[in-house]
């Protein structure tokens, strides 16, 4: 259903596909993480933290766990010392990439307005 088809019928935004999508990618960091993983994957935790910069280790860990639980991020552990863990996008997350491209295009058009 399109947005117009829900007009006047929705009592709770969480009951819509839009609400479901926001529950997966909403928040301050999830889209940033998905964007960075789309640019450079697989990527290790510390490299992801370095690229984001202002996120805390605890928050990054929490956001990655949520994205993994929602099926958007894969976590691969390597049995070695020191431990090595890499993160990458799932196929499900890959279907979000055209939306990210559209957001980037919107930003290009509107950034300086």
UniProtKB/Swiss-Prot annotation:
One MF term in the entry's GO annotations: DNA binding
Gene3D superfamilies tied to this protein: Winged helix-like DNA-binding domain superfamily/Winged helix DNA-binding domain
Keyword list, A-Z: DNA-binding, Transcription, Transcription regulation
Ranges of residues in domain HTH hxlR-type: 16-113
Keyword Protease part of the UniProt annotation: no
InterPro entries listed in its UniProt record: ArsR-like_HTH, HTH_HxlR, WH-like_DNA-bd_sf, WH_DNA-bd_sf
Protein name: Uncharacterized HTH-type transcriptional regulator BH0655
Organism listed in the record: Halalkalibacterium halodurans (strain ATCC BAA-125 / DSM 18197 / FERM 7344 / JCM 9153 / C-125)
